[in-house]
A protein has these predicted regions:
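Enzymes that bind and transform nitrogen-containing heteroaromatic metabolites
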Residues: 1-150
Length: 150
């Protein structure tokens, strides 16, 4: 599977059960990165994608039953269910237990330090930084994309 994750300068991912930040341009780039294929995530992450794209029906939002919506595949066990080559957007959980299944990591760096209590925990020692690029976001002057391969 391919892991997509956003981190701050200290590899922080969340603080007090909340994402550190989000960015509209970044979400669009993540959707483009998947090339229209299935993108795995949990319901917490799915909310930010659906609300921004404006395609979450009110009754689904109110009921909390998000399920699947086209390209986005929401499931609390998404890291267990994702198949080879399938992208997974991770915000709120450890990836280390799935290290043996990870084929690629796409790290988006916020270029800021935020408070954090959950950190990226998959060591990239021995991995190759295949590509690095910077781009302006909607709420961040610079977001850095790093692609790692084993």
């Amino acid at each position: 599977m391919k892991i997509i994750v956003c981190v701050d300068n200290q590899n922080g991912m969340m603080f007090n059960h909340r994402r550190q930040s989000q960015d509209r341009v970044l979400r669009k780039r993540i959707m483009e990165l998947t090339g229209g294929k299935k993108l795995w995530m949990n319901a917490y992450s799915q909310k930010q994608f659906l609300q921004v794209n404006g395609n979450m029906p009110k009754e689904q939002e109110q009921s909390g039953q998000l399920g699947q919506s086209g390209q986005i595949q929401a499931d609390e066990a998404f890291l267990e269910k994702a198949g080879p080559g399938e992208p997974c957007f991770v915000e709120d959980r450890s990836v280390a237990p799935f290290a043996g299944r990870v084929e690629r990591v796409v790290l988006y760096r916020w270029d800021r330090a935020y408070p954090a209590d959950l950190y990226w925990d998959l060591s990239l020692e021995g991995w190759t930084l295949a590509r690095r690029e910077e781009f302006p976001g909607s709420s961040h002057e610079i977001i850095t994309k790093e692609v790692y391969i084993p």
